Structure formats: structure tokens, C-alpha cells
A protein has these predicted regions:
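CBM-like, beta-strand-rich accessory domains located in the C-terminal region of large
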Residues: 50-52, 142-195
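Carbohydrate-active enzyme catalytic cores, enriched for enzymes
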Residues: 3-137, 182, 191-193
Length: 195
């Protein structure tokens, strides 16, 4: 949507304030960075909450569109000898990347808090890919509406996390409802060094 706005701004350059254009451009660059961090080695989205393939354009198509609009958006590559920890406190997610591995973890509160209809009981879940192969993934979602399968996909057992006493970490019910929500306290993210 923001790329489309930039396209429109180019069509009406004298009508859009320069600061609005610049802010939109800066936001697009940040969004591509976030997309890279939250994606696996296969260049596709991770399956947290109601994520699924085939809903949004493929990453390569978005990069191509951005390039046509004048952005220098390339596939980001993690250096071969690096271990990079991305602690995205605003969203609650954490990504740990090397050149061949990507671990993405959900340390986020259930949200958005005002309307969490697309949330799953996936607190503390993670996904892991090695190269372009996904090793551990959450279920994501394959359908909407009210059904047993929808509830199963939103439940804790459909995610790579701990389920205690067959209970969901958050109370998900109906197709898009959440009652009591998991709360992650004392969130601490960092590298551990060996002695």
C-alpha cells in the first residue's frame, strides 16, 4: 500500500508535501528491513498468528516494484561469520540469524490489544529454518470462519511452544475472539557468551 502511495505521489508531485513523501519513503525502507528479519531463508513469511502463503505479494515482487519506484531494495544477506540478534521490542519478535540459520521467536503480547481477532495462542513459539529449508514452523492459518479446524490452528498445540495440561496459552474462541491473554514478563534478549 505504501509503495502504491509513492507511485501516486510521483503522479502528483506538486500536491504532496515533501515531508510526507520523505516519511513514507523512510517507512518503506524500515518495512523491508522488518520483512527480511521476519522471513525465512526461502524468502517467505513466517507463520505467526494468521500468516499464510498466497495472501500478500511475494517478497521478490515487492522488491521489484520498489526498485521501479527508485528504491535500492536488495535481498539482504547475513555475513557468513556473523550471529545477528534482532530484538524488535515494538513488535515483540526476536530473530537470530546466521548465514545458514534463522530462528524467529514470538515474545510479543497478544495483539493488537484493541482487536486481537487474528491472534493465536502462540506465545513463546518459534520457527527455525536452515538455509532455504524450514525445520520448525507454526501452522499459520488455512481458513477463516468458525470451525473446529480454525480453533485447532489458533490453539497452542499448533505452535512450537509448550502446552501445559492441554490448555491454550491464551483463551482463543470462535473464529476471531481472544479472552484471557498470555503475558510475558521479564523479557530479556541478548547473546550469551561462553567462559
Amino acid at each position: 500500500d505504501l509503495l502504491d502511495l509513492i507511485n501516486l505521489f510521483k503522479s502528483y508531485p506538486s500536491r504532496i508535501p515533501v515531508d510526507v513523501i520523505e516519511l513514507t519513503k523512510q517507512t518503506i525502507v524500515k518495512m523491508f528491513g522488518w520483512l527480511h528479519i521476519m522471513s525465512h531463508g526461502d524468502d517467505k513469511v513466517s507463520f505467526f498468528n494468521d500468516s499464510a502463503f498466497g495472501i500478500a505479494p511475494e517478497h521478490a515482487i515487492l522488491r521489484e516494484y520498489a526498485t521501479k519506484l527508485g528504491f535500492a531494495i536488495n535481498e539482504l544477506v547475513t555475513p557468513t561469520d556473523a550471529l545477528i540478534v534482532h530484538n524488535m521490542q515494538n513488535t515483540g519478535y526476536v530473530s537470530v540469524k546466521t548465514a545458514e540459520m534463522n530462528l524467529i521467536a514470538d515474545l510479543a503480547p497478544v495483539g493488537p490489544s484493541y482487536i486481537p481477532g487474528h491472534a493465536h495462542a502462540d506465545s513463546l513459539s518459534f520457527e527455525l529454518s536452515l538455509g532455504k529449508s524450514r525445520v520448525f514452523v507454526n501452522s499459520g492459518t488455512s481458513l477463516y470462519g468458525i470451525s473446529i479446524e480454525r480453533l485447532r490452528q489458533r490453539g497452542t498445540s499448533a505452535h512450537n511452544t509448550v502446552e501445559i495440561n492441554n490448555k491454550n496459552s491464551s483463551q482463543v474462541w470462535s473464529g476471531f475472539r481472544v479472552a484471557k491473554r498470555a503475558d510475558i514478563g521479564n523479557r530479556l534478549v541478548g547473546k550469551v557468551t561462553s567462559s
